A protein has these predicted regions:
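Conserved core of the PLP fold type I
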Residues: 130, 135, 140-274, 285-286, ...
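N-terminal basic, amphipathic alpha-helical segments
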Residues: 1-133, 142, 153, 329, ...
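Conserved functional loop/turn residues at catalytic and ligand-binding sites
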Residues: 31, 66, 216, 281, ...
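Short glycine-rich anion-binding loops that position phosphate/pyrophosphate groups of nucleotides
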Residues: 116, 248-252, 313
């Protein structure tokens, strides 16, 4: 396929942006119609004498905005459902003002925090793994699952945390729950008495606030600055608080990281007071620059940190699968409450995640998504500079 446009290498605009713009113009004026197949990345790179990464960057941007649709082995096509658009030379009447932006004429853009790129999720692979787990499931897969979680998944999580987050724990210390909210419910039923005082980041994660209020906790807002939770302010406001809920790696919603001096100060306070730190380590797999920081739990020598993580923000939110790591001596108490609450996930989902981890798909998916998000950051930065 010979595309009806050329690139001007004398322009200051990046080549991938030119390529992206030429595709948009060709789609707008009808030279490329909905359903038309576009060249493969390798073929177009050879045709235009470009690096494959340049073509891939343009394609990813067009896919992200809904102009193209990737169909795996079937190739990439102009999105069939794409609404007709006007050529750039024709000025259309201004649309009425609306608070809801649309995504290439189709569905609204999803801009909520913590939502992964769902169009990049390996659905076929996931379906194959789930089907295999279902076929191989014995009686264990058809009855109520272990309230503590599927044993192979707990073992896989323990291995993953040791490698990626510096946390040394045994599978018996891990409890698989139906989302972060379920982790908080398990903690509150096991350790929190009526009216327990709890530090909470301000601003902080609204779901944590709601869950703790429903548990009857008395919340003490503690300000957050560019170093994360202000531990000195927390001590000044409620020195004898029994709990502190923090997002040290990627603060919600400000995105800052808790500095090492603050981490040590928080642990020192918890050790002296016998208080509990609830570490929400969501999104720790990603950083704008550098490698992820080790978890706060990895510095915990006295067993005062209750560590929570989730796969929902890395894989897909509908998974509703989180996990909680508790100190070894607290395992029996948490196990009793887990049996009573039944906040567990279906066996099939847990078994599929275990296979995804154990067979190396999770690590490959993370690497792929890190590259994708880095390109998205680049595109956003370029667009902001224009």
């Amino acid at each position: 396929m010979i595309l009806p446009f050329e690139l001007d290498r004398s322009q200051t605009a990046p080549i991938y942006r030119q390529l992206y713009q030429r595709f948009r113009e060709s789609i707008a004026d009808g030279r490329l119609r909905p359903g038309d197949r576009v060249p493969a990345v390798r073929a177009l790179a050879a045709e235009l004498n470009l690096a494959r990464g340049t073509v891939e960057a343009a394609y990813q941007l067009l896919i992200g905005e809904g102009y193209l649709t990737a169909r795996g082995a079937a190739g990439t096509v102009v999105t069939p459902q794409l609404a007709p658009v006007c050529a750039p030379t024709q000025r259309a009447p201004a649309p009425p003002t609306t608070h809801q932006a649309t995504h290439a004429g189709t569905s609204p853009l999803a801009l909520q925090m913590g939502l992964p790129a769902l169009d990049a999720f390996p659905r076929k692979l996931w379906t194959r793994l789930a089907g295999r787990q279902l076929r191989q499931a014995g009686v264990e897969g058809l009855v109520y699952p272990d309230a503590r979680g599927y044993a192979p998944l707990r073992a896989a999580i323990a291995s993953y945390l040791g490698i990626s987050r510096g946390i040394n724990c045994h599978p018996e210390q891990i409890f698989v729950c139906a989302g972060y909210r379920a982790c908080l419910d398990l903690i509150s039923h096991t350790l929190m008495g009526p009216g327990a005082t709890c530090w909470l980041e301000e601003p902080g994660y609204f779901m944590a606030r709601n869950a703790l209020l429903e548990a009857g906790a008395q919340l003490v807002p503690v300000p957050v600055d560019d170093q994360g939770l202000d531990v000195a302010q927390g001590i000044a406001r409620a020195p004898e608080a029994g709990f502190a809920v923090v997002t040290p790696t990627h603060q919600s919603p400000l995105g800052v990281s808790l500095s090492l001096p603050r981490r040590l100060a928080l642990l020192d306070w918890a050790n002296r007071q016998g208080s509990w730190i609830i570490e929400d380590d969501y999104d720790s797999e990603y950083r704008y620059q550098g490698k992820p920081l080790p978890a706060l739990k990895s510095l915990d020598q006295q067993g005062r940190v209750l560590y929570t993580g989730t796969f929902s923000k890395v894989l897909f939110p509908g998974l509703r699968l989180a996990y909680l790591v508790v100190p070894a001596e607290q395992t029996p108490a948490f196990a009793r409450q887990a049996d009573r609450l039944h906040n567990h996930c279906p066996h099939l989902q847990q078994a599929t995640v275990a296979a995804f981890l154990n067979e190396g798909h999770f690590a490959r998916h993370l690497n792929k998504m890190r590259g994708l998000y880095a390109r998205c950051l680049l595109y956003t930065s370029d667009a902001a500079d224009e």
